[in-house]
Protein backbone atom coordinates (compact mmCIF):
# COMPACT_ATOMS: atom_id res chain seq x y z
CA UNK A 1 0.00 0.00 0.00
CA UNK A 2 1.40 3.37 -1.05
CA UNK A 3 0.88 6.20 1.44
CA UNK A 4 1.70 9.81 0.57
CA UNK A 5 2.32 12.22 3.43
CA UNK A 6 1.80 15.88 2.52
CA UNK A 7 3.29 18.42 4.90
CA UNK A 8 4.10 22.10 5.27
CA UNK A 9 7.06 23.87 6.83
CA UNK A 10 6.15 26.98 8.82
CA UNK A 11 8.10 29.69 10.67
CA UNK A 12 8.28 29.59 14.46
CA UNK A 13 6.22 32.68 15.22
CA UNK A 14 7.53 32.78 18.80
CA UNK A 15 10.80 34.04 17.31
CA UNK A 16 9.16 37.12 15.78
CA UNK A 17 9.86 40.22 17.85
CA UNK A 18 6.85 42.31 18.80
CA UNK A 19 8.11 45.34 16.89
CA UNK A 20 8.42 43.21 13.72
CA UNK A 21 4.71 42.49 13.55
CA UNK A 22 4.28 45.20 10.95
CA UNK A 23 2.72 44.44 7.56
CA UNK A 24 4.50 45.64 4.44
CA UNK A 25 2.95 47.04 1.27
CA UNK A 26 1.66 43.58 0.33
CA UNK A 27 0.13 43.08 3.80
CA UNK A 28 2.77 40.49 4.74
CA UNK A 29 4.92 40.21 7.86
CA UNK A 30 8.59 39.33 7.31
CA UNK A 31 9.20 35.93 8.94
CA UNK A 32 12.23 34.98 6.83
CA UNK A 33 14.63 35.10 9.79
CA UNK A 34 12.52 32.86 12.05
CA UNK A 35 13.37 29.24 12.76
CA UNK A 36 11.58 26.73 10.54
CA UNK A 37 9.37 24.01 12.01
CA UNK A 38 7.15 21.15 10.92
CA UNK A 39 3.54 22.29 10.86
CA UNK A 40 2.25 20.69 14.07
CA UNK A 41 -0.65 18.77 12.51
CA UNK A 42 1.52 17.53 9.64
CA UNK A 43 4.21 16.41 12.09
CA UNK A 44 1.67 14.24 13.87
CA UNK A 45 0.48 12.86 10.52
CA UNK A 46 4.01 11.85 9.48
CA UNK A 47 4.67 10.15 12.82
CA UNK A 48 1.34 8.36 12.49
CA UNK A 49 2.49 6.99 9.13
CA UNK A 50 5.69 5.67 10.69
CA UNK A 51 3.76 4.01 13.52
CA UNK A 52 1.46 2.38 10.99
CA UNK A 53 4.52 1.00 9.22
CA UNK A 54 5.88 -0.27 12.54
CA UNK A 55 2.68 -2.27 13.09
CA UNK A 56 2.62 -3.80 9.61
CA UNK A 57 4.85 -6.81 10.32
CA UNK A 58 2.15 -8.78 12.10
CA UNK A 59 -0.43 -8.09 9.39
CA UNK A 60 1.57 -9.17 6.33
CA UNK A 61 1.11 -5.73 4.77
CA UNK A 62 3.88 -3.67 3.19
CA UNK A 63 3.57 0.11 3.39
CA UNK A 64 5.54 2.36 1.06
CA UNK A 65 5.84 5.78 2.71
CA UNK A 66 6.35 8.80 0.45
CA UNK A 67 6.36 12.53 1.19
CA UNK A 68 5.49 15.72 -0.68
CA UNK A 69 5.80 19.37 0.25
CA UNK A 70 5.33 22.67 -1.55
CA UNK A 71 8.23 24.83 -0.47
CA UNK A 72 11.60 26.48 -0.99
CA UNK A 73 15.08 25.04 -1.30
CA UNK A 74 15.78 25.52 2.41
CA UNK A 75 12.91 23.17 3.20
CA UNK A 76 14.72 20.17 1.70
CA UNK A 77 16.46 19.42 4.99
CA UNK A 78 13.09 18.26 6.29
CA UNK A 79 12.67 15.89 3.33
CA UNK A 80 16.14 14.49 4.03
CA UNK A 81 15.04 13.84 7.61
CA UNK A 82 12.14 11.78 6.30
CA UNK A 83 14.53 9.80 4.11
CA UNK A 84 16.58 9.04 7.22
CA UNK A 85 13.41 7.85 8.98
CA UNK A 86 12.67 5.32 6.26
CA UNK A 87 10.52 7.13 3.71
CA UNK A 88 10.94 5.74 0.19
CA UNK A 89 10.51 8.85 -1.94
CA UNK A 90 10.52 12.61 -1.30
CA UNK A 91 9.14 15.34 -3.56
CA UNK A 92 9.39 19.12 -3.37
CA UNK A 93 7.11 21.28 -5.47
CA UNK A 94 9.26 24.34 -6.11
CA UNK A 95 7.72 27.54 -4.76
CA UNK A 96 9.26 30.90 -5.60
CA UNK A 97 10.36 33.18 -2.77
CA UNK A 98 7.99 35.96 -3.87
CA UNK A 99 4.91 33.73 -4.13
CA UNK A 100 2.66 33.64 -1.07
CA UNK A 101 0.85 30.28 -0.91
CA UNK A 102 -0.53 30.54 2.61
CA UNK A 103 -4.07 31.19 1.42
CA UNK A 104 -4.11 29.08 -1.75
CA UNK A 105 -5.63 25.74 -0.69
CA UNK A 106 -7.10 25.21 -4.15
CA UNK A 107 -3.71 25.55 -5.81
CA UNK A 108 -2.06 23.17 -3.33
CA UNK A 109 -4.88 20.67 -3.89
CA UNK A 110 -4.51 20.99 -7.68
CA UNK A 111 -0.75 20.38 -7.58
CA UNK A 112 -1.06 17.38 -5.27
CA UNK A 113 -3.94 15.83 -7.22
CA UNK A 114 -2.04 16.21 -10.50
CA UNK A 115 1.02 14.52 -8.99
CA UNK A 116 -1.05 11.58 -7.73
CA UNK A 117 -2.97 11.19 -10.99
CA UNK A 118 -0.13 11.64 -13.49
CA UNK A 119 3.15 10.85 -11.75
CA UNK A 120 2.93 8.62 -8.69
CA UNK A 121 -0.32 6.91 -7.77
CA UNK A 122 -1.10 6.52 -4.08
CA UNK A 123 -3.62 4.52 -2.08
CA UNK A 124 -3.77 6.83 0.92
CA UNK A 125 -2.94 10.52 1.35
CA UNK A 126 -2.26 11.70 4.90
CA UNK A 127 -1.89 15.36 5.92
CA UNK A 128 -2.62 17.72 8.76
CA UNK A 129 -6.09 19.18 8.95
CA UNK A 130 -4.69 22.75 8.89
CA UNK A 131 -1.50 24.80 9.12
CA UNK A 132 -0.43 27.30 11.74
CA UNK A 133 -0.19 30.19 9.26
CA UNK A 134 -2.88 29.75 6.58
CA UNK A 135 -5.18 27.72 8.86
CA UNK A 136 -7.91 27.44 6.23
CA UNK A 137 -8.76 23.75 6.92
CA UNK A 138 -9.74 23.36 3.24
CA UNK A 139 -6.78 21.63 1.58
CA UNK A 140 -7.60 17.98 2.51
CA UNK A 141 -11.25 18.41 1.51
CA UNK A 142 -10.40 20.11 -1.79
CA UNK A 143 -7.81 17.44 -2.58
CA UNK A 144 -10.34 14.67 -1.95
CA UNK A 145 -12.79 16.48 -4.21
CA UNK A 146 -10.20 16.78 -7.00
CA UNK A 147 -9.45 13.05 -6.78
CA UNK A 148 -13.01 11.87 -6.18
CA UNK A 149 -11.94 10.14 -2.95
CA UNK A 150 -13.48 9.90 0.50
CA UNK A 151 -12.03 12.21 3.15
CA UNK A 152 -12.01 11.67 6.92
CA UNK A 153 -11.06 14.63 9.11
CA UNK A 154 -9.77 14.89 12.69
CA UNK A 155 -8.01 11.51 12.43
CA UNK A 156 -6.17 10.48 15.61
CA UNK A 157 -4.93 6.97 14.79
CA UNK A 158 -4.39 4.48 11.96
CA UNK A 159 -4.00 0.71 12.23
CA UNK A 160 -3.28 -1.91 9.56
CA UNK A 161 -5.92 -4.35 8.35
CA UNK A 162 -4.92 -5.59 4.89
CA UNK A 163 -3.77 -4.29 1.49
CA UNK A 164 -7.11 -2.63 0.77
CA UNK A 165 -8.28 -1.47 4.19
CA UNK A 166 -7.20 0.61 7.19
CA UNK A 167 -8.66 0.93 10.67
CA UNK A 168 -9.08 4.66 11.30
CA UNK A 169 -9.91 6.43 14.56
CA UNK A 170 -11.26 9.97 14.35
CA UNK A 171 -13.15 12.56 16.37
CA UNK A 172 -16.69 13.44 15.29
CA UNK A 173 -18.82 15.94 17.22
CA UNK A 174 -16.95 15.28 20.44
CA UNK A 175 -17.21 11.51 20.07
CA UNK A 176 -14.69 8.91 18.93
CA UNK A 177 -15.39 7.02 15.71
CA UNK A 178 -13.52 3.82 14.83
CA UNK A 179 -14.10 2.46 11.34
CA UNK A 180 -12.50 0.19 8.79
CA UNK A 181 -12.15 2.13 5.54
CA UNK A 182 -11.39 1.11 1.99
CA UNK A 183 -8.63 2.81 0.02
CA UNK A 184 -8.17 5.15 -1.79
CA UNK A 185 -8.84 7.76 0.86
CA UNK A 186 -7.62 11.13 2.16
CA UNK A 187 -6.99 11.32 5.91
CA UNK A 188 -6.73 14.72 7.63
CA UNK A 189 -5.00 14.40 11.00
CA UNK A 190 -6.16 16.55 13.90
CA UNK A 191 -4.99 16.53 17.52
CA UNK A 192 -3.25 13.18 17.38
CA UNK A 193 -1.62 11.65 20.50
CA UNK A 194 1.59 11.16 18.49
CA UNK A 195 2.21 14.88 18.09
CA UNK A 196 6.00 14.78 17.60
CA UNK A 197 8.06 13.18 14.87
CA UNK A 198 10.75 10.77 15.99
CA UNK A 199 14.40 11.77 15.54
CA UNK A 200 16.58 9.74 13.13
CA UNK A 201 19.95 8.42 14.24
CA UNK A 202 23.14 9.98 12.93
CA UNK A 203 23.91 6.68 11.19
CA UNK A 204 20.60 6.78 9.31
CA UNK A 205 21.14 10.43 8.39
CA UNK A 206 24.51 9.60 6.85
CA UNK A 207 23.26 6.46 5.13
CA UNK A 208 19.81 7.48 3.89
CA UNK A 209 19.57 11.26 4.13
CA UNK A 210 21.60 11.99 0.99
CA UNK A 211 19.22 10.38 -1.48
CA UNK A 212 18.00 12.62 -4.33
CA UNK A 213 14.82 14.65 -3.95
CA UNK A 214 12.39 14.91 -6.86
CA UNK A 215 11.54 18.46 -7.97
CA UNK A 216 8.32 19.63 -9.61
CA UNK A 217 7.73 23.08 -11.10
CA UNK A 218 4.77 25.12 -9.89
CA UNK A 219 4.65 27.59 -12.81
CA UNK A 220 1.95 25.91 -14.91
CA UNK A 221 -0.43 25.30 -12.01
CA UNK A 222 0.18 28.81 -10.66
CA UNK A 223 -0.67 30.38 -14.02
CA UNK A 224 -3.88 28.34 -14.28
CA UNK A 225 -4.87 29.28 -10.74
CA UNK A 226 -4.24 32.98 -11.30
CA UNK A 227 -6.28 32.91 -14.51
CA UNK A 228 -9.27 31.62 -12.52
CA UNK A 229 -8.98 34.21 -9.75
CA UNK A 230 -11.40 37.08 -9.36
CA UNK A 231 -9.70 40.47 -9.56
CA UNK A 232 -10.94 43.27 -7.28
CA UNK A 233 -11.31 46.47 -9.34
CA UNK A 234 -12.66 48.76 -6.65
CA UNK A 235 -15.04 49.32 -3.74
CA UNK A 236 -18.12 51.53 -3.78
CA UNK A 237 -19.89 52.59 -0.56
CA UNK A 238 -23.54 51.59 -0.26
Regions found by a protein language model. Name each.
Residues 77-111:
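A glycine-rich helix N-cap at a beta->alpha junction
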Residues 1-66:
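N-terminal beta-strand-loop-alpha-helix module at the start
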Residues 155-238:
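Electrostatically charged, flexible surface regions
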Residues 112-122:
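Glycine-rich phosphate-binding loop signature in dinucleotide/nucleotide-binding domains
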Residues 71-74, 130-135:
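Gly/Ser/Thr-rich loops at beta-strand to alpha-helix junctions
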Residues 64-72, 92:
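Short internal beta-strands
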Residues 134-149:
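Short Gly/Thr/Asp-enriched flexible loops that form oxyanion-binding sites at enzyme active sites
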Residues 24-35, 88-96, 121-127:
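Glycine/charged-rich beta-loop-alpha catalytic/anionic-binding loops adjacent to active sites
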Amino acid sequence: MKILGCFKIVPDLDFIAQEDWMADGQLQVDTSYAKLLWNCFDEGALEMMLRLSDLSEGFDVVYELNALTVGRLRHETFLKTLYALGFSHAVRVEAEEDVDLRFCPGLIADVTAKYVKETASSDVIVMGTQSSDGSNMKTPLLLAERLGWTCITQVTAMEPVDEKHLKVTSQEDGKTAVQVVTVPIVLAVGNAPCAYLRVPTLKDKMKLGKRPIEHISLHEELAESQSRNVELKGLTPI
